[in-house]
Amino acid sequence: MASSNFLVLLLFALFAIPQGLANYEKPPVYQPPVYKPPVEKPPVYKPPVEKPPVYKPPVEKPPVYKPPVYKPPVYKPPVVKPPVYKPPVYKPPVYKPPVYKPPVEKPPVYKPPVYKPPVVKPPVYKPPVYKPPVEKPPVYKPPVVKPPVYKPPVYKPPVVKPPVYKPPVYKPPVYKPPVEKPPVYKPPVYKPPVEKPPVYGPPHHP
């Protein structure tokens, strides 16, 4: 086996060395680049991978005791506002012409008389009912005397609760994507001009 490998290597060396020397003596031959069109591969369909839902047990937070915060009352001094003088505003009388309303004529409506026959109710006779008087003899109830009950004091030893170790709860950071709000278009609002009546001030005496 070793001799066969040695013979193969020897033959390869004898063939390769002269070929290499021949290639070294010849100048390099220019070969233009060959255009290879890109190979288009059809898309491979990959079915979606379904992941089973992961159950996360709810994290119980112990109630936190917050002592009440005492806020002292804040003294606010009374605010004194000086009287504001408002001159009388003269309003000229507004003349409204009388509105003519023609009289409305309603034709008379005829209502025939309604005949109601008289209703006869015969008298109902109720015989008198005799109720004899009920006599109840007096009932004697002797006074009830209850002796005092002695209750010895009950000793309750103090209850000692060992400290409970609560491991810290790890909360992973929650990623909140930025919220993009589209711009809201507000059409221009037309405001008609406001006409203010002239204000007449008090008359000035010379």
From Swiss-Prot:
Q: Which stretches are sequence repeats?
A: 32-36, 37-41, 42-46, 47-51, 52-56, 57-61, 62-66, 67-71, 72-76, 77-81, 82-86, 87-91, 92-96, 97-101, 102-106, 107-111, 112-116, 117-121, 122-126, 127-131, 132-136, 137-141, 142-146, 147-151, 152-156, 157-161, 162-166, 167-171, 172-176, 177-181, 182-186, 187-191, 192-196, 197-201
Record family assignment: Belongs to the plant proline-rich protein superfamily. ENOD12 family.
Q: Does the keyword Signal apply?
A: yes
Keyword check for Repeat? yes
Name listed for the protein in its UniProt record = Repetitive proline-rich cell wall protein 1
Which residues lie within the region annotated 34 X 5 AA approximate tandem repeats of P-P-V-[EVY]-K?
Answer: 32-201
Q: Where expressed (tissue)?
A: Expressed in hypocotyls, roots and mature root nodules.
Q: Which residues form a coiled coil?
A: none
Q: Which GO terms describe its molecular function?
A: structural constituent of cell wall
**GO cellular-component terms in the record?**
extracellular region
Instruction: Kindly state which keywords UniProt assigns to this record, in alphabetical order.
Output: Cell wall, Developmental protein, Repeat, Secreted, Signal
Residues making up the signal peptide according to the UniProt record: 1-22
Cite the residue spans of the region called Disordered: 51-84, 132-206
Q: What does this protein do?
A: This is a developmentally regulated putative cell wall protein.
The record's listing under InterPro entries reads: Adhesive_plaq, Extensin-like, Proline-rich_CW_protein
Where is it localised?
A: Secreted, Cell wall
State one Pfam family annotation. Extensin_1
